Amino acid sequence: VGMVAGAGLLAGCATAPLYGNPELPAAPRQPPVDYFQVNWWTGLVEKVPLLEYSPREPASPVYDPESRNVIVQTRDGYVRAVGPDGKVAWSLRTGARALAGGLVSEGVVYLPGGDGVLYALDGRTGAVKWKYATSESLATVPVLADGLVLVTSDTDTVFAVKATDGAWAWQYRRDPPSGFTVRGASAPRVDQGTAYVGFSDGFLVALKVEDGGVVWEKSLSGSGTEFLDVDTTPAIDSAGRLYVASYKNGLYALEADSGAVIWNASVGGLTSLLARGEVVFATGDGRVDAYLGETGKLIWSLPLKNRTALAPVLARGMLLVPNERALLFVDPTTGKSRMAWNPGVGISAPPFVVGSRVYVLSNNAYLYALDLNDVKKGPRG
């Protein structure tokens, strides 16, 4: 564990400066203090295979407020808990490469395994409370609703198990299309007893949480067999509008109770959404967009050239967007990229925000605790 301060390297990422030290990931350099400070960092994967050309860590860290541990799954098949001092408190070998991060509720950590096993662990000790085995790779952050844990596989099955003991409750499956699909899966979004889930065949389906019964289904990608995916986790705003994106046909706003289309912005390649207030942020192939939720009007668009923008989060007035190369700091009002920070070989996992603290897992499996300032008032680099 350590921390090194210093000036960063400048490089182009949109129009923002890039800060970091890609050649020496064990010594992350500080960006200007107007943005954040690296409170601590720790390496999690001890040995990197010599033939691993482009390591990738897609599983977001998750914070347990009861134990104050950060729970992380990494590509070496381990789950680790990192304490508030940046030191590993416990570890558990699952042997499976993780595709998504976990969920914490009342001291229990629910973790999806790439080997198809859903784990419930004690956040303080790592003890296994129960596990439920499927035959499919689990690919989304679990959701807790009405006493059930819901999770989606990478082959279009939603599993629901009881949170108390992991007993099977129900499952819903759709057959994937015969053509090419996009990597990723839609986690269920639950609202008022209904789970909204997208599938790789281009359908958005509303399911009853209690038994998995279909409330309605809606095709959003039209005809064809390739890249029909609705892999975005749906979002719902305070007005009750349901937002979801088809990789082929763009961003939709729907009536949550019926699936009726309110509007559609025909922008292909979108893979993640975030709704806050009256604005919907959408990210995907080479772009970050902001839309007005009521009408679908484009507020701004930030091009990223050949980079894919992954799932964004909001923290201290900034939109934080991993783009595989770095973590972008984007002004959510104007769409201007203020800064990019690369701690090593890029970032694929969404950061986890706890107040002004942001936990970031880099692609070379270093976990960083960043303390953010009021970054909207930072320099206009």
Walk through the language-model features, giving the residues of each:
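Extracytoplasmic beta-rich repeat domains
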Residues: 17-63, 89-105, 128-146, 168-192, ...
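C-terminal closing repeat unit and adjoining cap/tail of repeat-based domains
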Residues: 318, 322-365, 372-380
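Conserved beta-propeller blade signature
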Residues: 69-71, 109-111, 149-151, 159, ...
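Short loop/turn segments that connect beta-strands within beta-propeller blades
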Residues: 83-87, 122-125, 162-166, 208-212, ...
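Structural signature of WD-repeat beta-propellers
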Residues: 74, 113-114, 153-154, 199-200, ...
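N-terminal export leaders
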Residues: 1-3, 212
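C-terminal motif of bacterial Sec signal peptides marking the signal peptidase cleavage site
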Residues: 10-12
